[in-house]
Amino acid sequence: MRNRFVSFLGVASYFAAGNFHSISHGRLHAAKQIAHTRAVNTNSTNFARVAFFPNGTLSGLGLSSTCEDALYATVDCDDEISSVMTDGYIGSLDNETLTDLICASTCEASIAELYDSVSTSCGDSAELIAGISYLSLIGQVWSSWNQSCFVDLTTGQNCNDVIAKFDNVTSQADIATTDLCSYCYVKKLEMMQADAYSSAYNDDFESEYKYVANTCNLTVTDFNATTSVFNASLPATTSTCLSGNTYITTDGDTCDSIALAQGVSAATLFYTNPNILNCSDIITGTSLCLPLTCTDLYSVQSNDTCASVAVSNFISFSDVINWNSQLTWNCSNLVSPDPHWGSVLCASAPGGNYTGQALTTTSSSDATDIVDPPTGVTVAIGSTLDCGAWFVNEASLGYNCSSICLSNSIAMHLFVDANPSLNYTTCDSDLVTGDAYCVDPLTNWEYYSSNTTSISTVTAAISPTWPVQTGIDSNCDAYYEVQSSSTTASSTPAATTAISSSTPLTSNSTSTTVTPPAATQSGIPANCIEYYVAQSGDTCATVETKHSITAAQFLSWNPAVSSDCTTGFWADEAYCVSVS
C-alpha cells in the first residue's frame, strides 16, 4: 500500500505538481483558526477502522511516544474517506452509496476524537515537514469531511448533491434566486471562506460570495480568504511546455475553440495552464502552453459518460482518462461545471502512436538492443524489461515526470504505459526514489517479454487439437474455435493457433492467445489465458475469491490496478485472472 494515507494527506496535495487544477490556480492561504462545525448527518455504519498513518511509518522522526501513538490511532470510517481529500473545490461525489459511506456520522465523530487526541498529545508544533503540522493534516481531513457531508436542514439531502442539480448557467445573474439564496449554497460559500485548509476560495469565489450576500440581503463581516494553517514554502519550479508549442489568446477564445483549432484536448489545455481562470472567457493576450496534438477529437454531449465516449471511439475507458488530464480517475467531472473545462477531448493518443525501436535479439551492441536495468537498483513494479534505456529516479535530480520525459525524448503516455506503476494523472507522486524506469521501450514491447526463451522455428503444418469440418485448405496456418457468449474469456473457447512466415521476428512459435472480452488496461501480460469482466459491485477481493487466486497474483497480472484497489478497477473492463 506504500503508506497510502501519508501520500494523500496535505503534503501530496501541495507538492505533487498538477494533481488538481485548483492547486496550480490557487494559492496556499496563510493561518486563521476556524471552529469545526459538525455537519448534520445521522448515517451510522460499522467499518473496518482506517489508520491515517499506518503503524510504524512515523518511527525515527523524533516524535514523542505519546504523540506517535496518537497518530497511529484508527478512525471508524470507510476507506473511501481518501476520495474527499483535495486542496481544491469539493463538490458532489455523484454516487449516493459512496456519499452515505463517507458521510456516516460515526466517521465524523471518530475524526473529531482523533483531532482532540493529536491536539493533546502532539500540539501544533510537531511537524511532518517544516510548516505542516500533523494536527493540521488531521484538521484538513475534518474540514474536507464537513464540506463533503453537510446537508440541507429541511430536506436532509446532501448539499453538494443539491447544488449539483442547479441549472447550468454562464452568468451569476442567470442563477435562480431560490438556488442562489438557498441554505446549501450560502452555507457552501460560508464554509469555503472559513476554510483554512484549502486554496479553493479564490478571487472568483470571493466575488461570488459578495454577489450572493448583496442579492440575498446577508450580513457578512469578512469576504477575504481565511489564512492557511499551512506555512510551508513551495519549492521553486521551472515552467516547461512539454509540446514546445505556445499560443497567445485572442478576443473570444475559449478552451473548446482553441482545442478544435489546434487539435488538442480542452481538458488537458485547462489542466496544464493555471492562468486560465474561466474556460468560457479567457483573457485576451494570455500565453498558453498547448498540449500534444491528437488526430481524433470528440465533443462531449450532455448525456455522455467516459464509457460511452470510449465505445463511440473504439478506445478503452482508461484511454479517455489518460489522454485528457483534467478528468478525474472515475470520470465524475466529464460534464461537471466545477470547474467547467470545456467539452473537446482527445480520442486518440496525444503525440500520435509510438512505433518504438526495432526489437532484436542479436548480440550486436547497437542502440536497438535490449539494455539491462542498471546494476544495484530496483526496477519499478511492472515496468517492461524490453527496454533500450533506463532512468534511475535519484532524489538529488529533483525530476518530475515531465522533466524525465523531456530529457529522454519520450511521450508521457508511452512513459506511463511502459511503467504501469505510474498513473497519468498522479505520475509525479507515484515516482519512487531510487527505482529504475524504462524510458525507451522497444517495438512490440507490449507483446514480448525479455524474460521469455526463444524456441526453434516451426516449419511443420499446424494441426488443430479440436474437431474441424472437412474441406479446409491444407495450407491453413490459423484456426479459431467458435465460443459462446460469456463475461469470462479463457484459452479453451477462444484458442487461436497461428504461425506467420512473414513476421520479421527472430523466432516463430505456436501460441495460444485469448481475445479480451472487453476493454483492458495497460500492463496485462501477453500470456494471459483467462479474463473476467468486472460487474457492478465487484471488488478486487471478490474477483480473487471467485477465481481462486491471490491478491498478489491479481495485482501482478493487472498492474494498472492500485494495491488497495481504489484506482484502476472499474466495472465493464476485463481483468486477467489466469496466465499460462
Swiss-Prot record:
CDD domains: LysM. Keywords: Chitin-binding, Glycoprotein, Repeat, Secreted, Signal, Virulence. SUPFAM superfamilies: LysM domain. One of its GO terms (cellular component) is extracellular region. The keyword Disulfide bond does not apply. Pfam families: LysM. The LysM (lysin motif) domains are small globular domains involved in binding chitin in eukaryotes. LysM7 contains 4 LysM domains. This is Secreted LysM effector LysM7. It comes from Penicillium expansum (Blue mold rot fungus).
